[in-house]
């Protein structure tokens, strides 16, 4: 099956912030946790989907292998080894439902593996009205499997109109900002929020780079990193 590129068109998409202890919410739907971590060699995980509304909500939950292109778009590929139970559930008002999942067998590779659990609200036939389009909600939860030693390792290079930041490490990072400093010590900070997956890269638009760019610093949820700049 062809990969799907995640879109928020006609959907209310709640981005799951890593490290948060609060549930991710979209309308009346919520999920907890907002990021799932599975230890190396393990397969099982779970997710609680809540309905804070005043009417029943039916949801479909699916698991996808997850990657990102260098423009920052999520690529979701159906993964038959990612099993979700139940895949479809109706949740009563002000109630919640536990969803269990089983990941594909661990291949033993040292690099972190990543998926996304997608929770989609399904149309409610009782709410259908002629000429009215229902707004359906979506929640997207990242799932990571890695050992405790997994960590990012960044390099950077100049790309047309921006800076290409690559992660050659074994673990992901949730980037929050990138600071560029020139030889005179003048710094420009770009507030950017994105996941940089293990083995992945992203081009960060910068416009014109500082003359004599001398240092790059990435601030992420995992810490702050001085990033070497590759010379042409």
Task: Give the label of every model feature segment.
Residues 104-150, 210-232:
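Terminal connector regions
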Residues 74-107, 186-211:
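Intrinsically disordered, low-complexity Pro/Gly/Ser/Thr-rich segments with frequent PxxP/GP/PP motifs
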Residues 26-53, 88, 148-158:
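Beta-sheet-dominated interaction scaffolds and their linkers
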Residues 27-30, 52-98:
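Surface-exposed binding patches on compact interaction domains or structured appendages
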Residues 47-53, 163-171:
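Asparagine-centered strand-capping/turn motif at beta-strand->loop junctions
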Residues 20-26:
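Sec/Tat signal peptide C-region and signal peptidase I cleavage site
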Residues 65-78, 126-127, 181-189:
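Short aromatic-acidic-glycine turn motif
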Residues 8-18:
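Bacterial N-terminal signal peptides
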């Amino acid at each position: 099956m062809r990969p799907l590129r995640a879109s928020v068109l006609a959907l209310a998409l709640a981005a799951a912030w890593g490290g948060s202890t609060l549930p991710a919410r979209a309308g009346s739907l919520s999920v907890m946790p907002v990021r799932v971590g599975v230890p190396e060699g393990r397969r099982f995980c779970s997710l609680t989907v809540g309905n804070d509304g005043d009417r029943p909500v039916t949801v479909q939950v699916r698991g996808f292998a997850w990657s990102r292109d260098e423009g920052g778009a999520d690529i979701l590929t159906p993964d038959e080894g990612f099993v979700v139970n139940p895949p479809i559930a109706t949740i009563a008002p002000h109630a919640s439902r536990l969803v269990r999942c089983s990941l594909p067998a661990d291949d033993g590779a040292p690099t972190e593996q990543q998926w996304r659990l997608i929770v989609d609200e399904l149309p409610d036939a009782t709410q259908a009205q002629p000429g009215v389009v229902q707004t359906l909600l979506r929640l997207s939860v990242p799932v990571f499997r890695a050992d405790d030693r997994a960590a990012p390792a960044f390099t950077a290079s100049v790309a047309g109109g921006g800076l290409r930041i690559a992660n050659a490490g074994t673990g992901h990072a949730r980037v929050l900002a990138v600071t560029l400093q020139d030889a005179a010590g003048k710094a420009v900070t770009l507030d950017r929020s994105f996941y940089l997956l293990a083995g992945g890269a992203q081009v960060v638009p910068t416009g014109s780079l500082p003359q004599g760019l001398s240092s790059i610093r990435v601030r992420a949820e995992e810490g702050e990193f001085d990033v070497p700049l590759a010379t042409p």
